[in-house]
Curated annotation (Swiss-Prot):
It comes from the Eukaryota. The gene is raraa. A zinc finger (NR C4-type) spans 75-95, 111-130. It comes from Danio rerio (Zebrafish). GO terms for biological process: cell differentiation; hindbrain morphogenesis; liver development; negative regulation of transcription by RNA polymerase II; positive regulation of transcription by RNA polymerase II; response to retinoic acid; retinoic acid receptor signaling pathway. Belongs to the nuclear hormone receptor family. NR1 subfamily. Composed of three domains: a modulating N-terminal domain, a DNA-binding domain and a C-terminal ligand-binding domain. In the embryo, zygotic expression largely overlaps that of rarab, with high levels in hindbrain, lateral mesoderm and tail bud. In the adult, strong expression in brain and muscle, weaker expression in ovary, liver and digestive tract. Heterodimer; with an rxr molecule. Binds DNA preferentially as a rar/rxr heterodimer. This is Retinoic acid receptor alpha-A.
Length: 444
């Protein structure tokens, strides 16, 4: 047997496997071919080295650095920080929105000086006429606004792939029942004969005793009306008495605030109670609202764009009341079951009433969160009022509102009184059965 070893491309050396003799060239290479063989061998070695080197250099390249953030020139109109190019020029969000609204609504402004007001970040809101003129001077395009508006109109005309929101007979009957319950316990603003009082201070004071007496009287009647409203809701009276009282205490202030805010008149910045008494912001503060006043008026302004009718206000009030996450409920699951059809009814009703505003239903539900936040502060206000009023707090107001959910009772005597009436106790003044026999009253 023979083996061979390749020592260069042209020279072969054989040896006998058994004798292991010396390696002897079979034939000496010809001198003429040595240079060619050397070149070929060298080229072969070079080729191998090149391939080896290239294979070692195949490594992943490092990631490229992120592009630097775009930096725009300051707003051409007011020199504020620009958010990009809008309607042809570099502009801030404020000037962009101002120009768009002015063109879309064909606004006509007037300058109260000499039509040469300085427009900058500080003064841009002082003269709308000069601000609009500067927008046009720096090159903002009216046509761009019109094209943008036409584009949005075309998008609105596209058929929407929406769910089928059809009112079933049962749902329609439920909505009618809740609407009727709301209307019977809370007359609308157009049904009232407004009157005002001139015997109050024109500036904010700690407490106007006369206004407080009137306000506390109306609030007591309103609480009774809230109980009457609750009794008419589907399934409410099937709950245990303890759960009915727990729900009423937890949601009463929510419903009171929601109701009074639907009687807000933005032109006069006033609110009207059910007997027609109309109070402005200062009078509401002095009547007992105190630091709660601005929160309530701000919430009333937020309700205006929703344009809620009686059915929607009644359904939202019912959803606030029948909420299974209240503390100390005996049958929380049953309360949730009662709330579900109310949520579905409100969703279908709102979508049918506003087919092109699909986000209106979740916006309404978000108001429940706002109401709870205001109510928590309202319950605290009831406690501080007891130290400001000359006499005692009306018992129904103290019992219903002071123990609102989430409020920690005060220490000492206040704490003992608060703990005396637990959320599940059957207080005669709060009992839905006692409300049934109460005489007809007006709510604020």
């Amino acid at each position: 047997m023979y083996e061979s070893v390749d020592v260069n491309p042209f020279l072969m050396m054989d040896y006998y496997n058994q004798s292991r003799g010396c390696l002897i060239p079979d034939k000496m290479p010809h001198p003429f071919s040595s240079s060619i063989r050397h070149q070929h061998w060298s080229g072969s070695n070079h080729s191998i080295e090149t391939q080896s080197t290239s294979s070692e250099e195949i490594v992943p390249s490092p990631p490229s650095p992120p592009p630097p953030p775009r930096i725009y020139k300051p707003c051409f109109v007011c020199q504020d920080k620009s958010s990009g190019y809008h309607y042809g020029v570099s502009a801030c969000e404020g000037c962009k929105g101002f120009f768009r609204r002015s063109i879309q609504k064909n606004m006509v402004y007037t300058c109260h000086r000499e039509k040469n007001c300085i427009i900058n970040k500080v003064t841009r809101n002082r003269c709308q006429y000069c601000r609009l003129q500067k927008c046009l001077e720096v090159g903002m395009s009216k046509e761009s606004v019109r094209n943008d508006r036409n584009k949005k109109k075309k998008e609105e005309k596209k058929p929407e792939c929406t769910e089928n929101y059809t009112l079933s007979p049962d749902t329609e009957q439920m909505i009618d029942r809740v609407r009727k319950a709301h209307q019977e316990t809370f007359p609308s603003l157009c049904q009232l004969g407004k009157y005002t009082t001139s015997n109050s201070s024109e500036r904010r004071v700690a407490l106007d005793v006369d206004l407080w007496d009137k306000f506390s009287e109306l609030s007591t009647k309103c609480i009774i009306k809230t109980v009457e409203f609750a009794k008419q809701l589907p399934g409410f009276t099937t709950l245990t008495i303890a759960d009915q009282i727990t729900l009423l205490k937890a949601a009463c202030l929510d419903i009171l605030i929601l109701r009074i805010c639907t009687r807000y008149t933005p032109e006069q910045d006033t609110m009207t109670f059910s007997d027609g008494l109309t109070l402005n912001r200062t009078q509401m503060h002095n009547a007992g609202f105190g630091p709660l006043t601005d929160l309530v008026f701000a919430f009333a302004n937020q309700l205006l764009p929703l344009e809620m009718d009686d059915a929607e206000t009644g359904l939202l009030s019912a959803i606030c009341l029948l909420c299974g996450d209240r503390q100390d409920l005996e049958q929380a699951d049953k309360v949730d079951v009662l709330q579900e059809p109310l949520l579905e009814a409100l969703k279908i009703y709102v979508r049918n009433r506003r087919p092109h505003k699909p986000h209106m239903f979740p916006k309404m539900l978000m108001k429940i969160t706002d109401l709870r936040s205001i109510s928590a502060k309202g319950a605290e206000r009831v406690i501080t009022l007891k130290m400001e009023i000359p006499g005692s707090m009306p018992p129904l107001i103290q019992e219903m509102l002071e123990n609102s959910e989430g409020l920690e009772s005060s220490s000492g005597a206040q704490g003992s009184r608060a703990s005396a009436t637990t959320p599940g106790s059957c207080s005669p003044s709060l009992s839905p059965n006692s409300a049934q026999s109460s005489p007809p009253t007006q709510s604020p």
